[in-house]
Amino acid sequence: MKALQLFFVFILCSTARALNATASCTIDRYEHVDSVVSQCKSITVESFAVPAGQTLKLHLQAGTTLTFNGNIAFAYKEWDGPLMWIKGNGITVQGTNSHLINGRGELWWDGHGGHNNKKKPQLMMIQASGNSVFKNIKVKNCPLTCIGISDSHGITLQQWTIDNKDGDTKGGINTDGFDIARSDKVTIKDSTVINQDDCICVNQGQHLLFTNLHCIGGHGLSIAAGLYSTYEMNTVYNVTFTNSILENSRNAIHIKTIPDANKKGEITSITYDNIKLIGISFYAINVQEDYTNDGSTGHPLGNIPVKDLKINNIYGTMSGPYAVKVYILCGSGGCSNWKWSNINVSGAARSNSCNFTPNGFSC
């Protein structure tokens, strides 16, 4: 009998240890983050609030699987952020159907975005490698840029929903969906972005694929180069946008370079293919080499040439009094070897404007 009692005690103690081990790998308070991340490789994140001015740092061990299962919200402070920072090699980050990452952007929005003295934080920074996967993630109301991807190599983001539609009426500005820099072999697919700025914006990177996206509102599928001082950091190479829908956006396709003779770089081997447009209000295709945050200068430079630009099967509708199907403004020597085909867009209210003519398209 005594031996039997000891056996049951052992079983109960073992079960308790197992339960404690499981519980210790669940984050349900901000104070638990560091200990769980350092000890566990299978992590569940439940609901809690991140204190004002703090970054939720999920710097994961290699091979970790992290699952968002609750609602994460962030307290208000005027600062640069990011509010969340996910980092790791060979990691899987996923969400259940019940989770939400709520940036509470309505607390910061003022109709000025990043163009005044009121600081607004980026919602999330991702730095990952080793075939890491981020899937089924739901994000709401980013104060400024939603997702920044930097220093990442060989990662996939899929089945994301970024819902910033509240910003349409509450002053959301510069709420880019995904910004990419210093990265290669990044894929973003099967995702929806509702926002007030670029759906995708590539600042620097190579071997990037964006497919099966639905971008609503915002400013389109963009490449923006010239932000940095070095040639390498102003170079974008081998980027493909395909099989996507742009709906009620300002632009559909937008390539923009900053005219600064001291900043060199290049944009090469870019493909836009099979893009559907619905109600685009300004430009179906806009390539400009005179872009600044304060607006277009009207004086393009070829300091960052756009080469080997392939655009095919762009179709759909535009609406409104400012709609232009194609706008091209190249600096001297700034555009070469463009091949366009099957540009079938209706509803433009204004004529095309081009100072460079692509092969296969007549302005």
Model-predicted segments: where are they?
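Extracellular beta-strand-rich solenoid/capping regions of secreted or surface-exposed proteins
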Residues: 29-39, 50-67, 73-93, 104-130, ...
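Extracellular beta-rich repeat passengers
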Residues: 46, 249-363
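Fungal secretory targeting signals
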Residues: 1-20
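Short glycine/acidic-rich loop motifs that flank beta-strands on beta-rich extracellular proteins
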Residues: 52-55, 76-81, 104-107, 122, ...
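Right-handed parallel beta-helix
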Residues: 63, 68-70, 89-99, 130-141, ...
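Right-handed parallel beta-helix/beta-solenoid
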Residues: 17-32
